[in-house]
């Protein structure tokens, strides 16, 4: 075997050096890529952990808010039931008081004529009794009623104590 020519040896050495440099470059790039991937994986794991913690906190906050809203709903429903009971009670009271209200309305409608009648009666009382010459056994008006009767209210008050009259035969 003969030795390769020096040019071939130099070319082969240059080629080996280039392959060696290329391999070293690729190893450096591979190490850099691995470091980058590890750093990204760590960042992603950290972000994932942060997002999971935030998601858990949101879940707890949602559960607290749901609990609060359920309590408010129960309270509101109790208030509604209470108010409905109060409305029913007031409606019943209104139905019970309506006849009295109707009566009071009738009284207020009839009040002006009654007031006028009372004023007229007061005027009549202020006129006083008739002179005594006309009141003894004489009629005030021809073909009219006899002398006015006294106030019968005093007589009726005393009748409660008297025995009632019994009609029929006595034995």
Curated annotation (Swiss-Prot):
Residues 7-98 form a coiled coil. This is Vimentin-type intermediate filament-associated coiled-coil protein. Residues 126-171 are annotated as: Disordered. Keywords: Coiled coil, Cytoplasm. GO terms for cellular component: cytoplasm; type III intermediate filament. Signal peptide: none annotated. The keyword GTP-binding does not apply. It is found in: Cytoplasm. Expressed in brain, heart, kidney, liver, lung, skeletal muscle, spleen and testis. Within the kidney expression is pronounced within glomeruli.
């Amino acid at each position: 075997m003969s030795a390769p020519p020096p040019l071939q040896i130099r070319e082969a050495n240059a080629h080996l050096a280039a392959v060696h440099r290329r391999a070293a470059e690729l190893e450096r790039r591979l190490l850099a890529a691995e470091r980058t991937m590890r750093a990204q994986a760590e960042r992603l794991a950290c972000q994932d952990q942060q997002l999971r913690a935030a998601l858990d906190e949101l879940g707890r906050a949602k559960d607290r808010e749901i609990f609060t809203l359920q309590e408010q709903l129960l309270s509101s429903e109790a208030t509604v039931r209470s108010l409905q009971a109060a409305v029913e009670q007031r409606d019943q009271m209104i139905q019970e008081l309506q006849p009295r209200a109707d009566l009071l309305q009738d009284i207020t409608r009839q009040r002006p004529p009654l007031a006028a009648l009372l004023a007229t009666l007061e005027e009549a009382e202020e006129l006083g009794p008739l002179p005594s010459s006309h009141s003894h056994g004489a009629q005030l008006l021809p073909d009219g009623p006899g002398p006015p009767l006294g106030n019968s209210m005093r007589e009726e008050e005393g009748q409660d104590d008297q025995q009632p009259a019994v009609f029929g035969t006595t034995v």
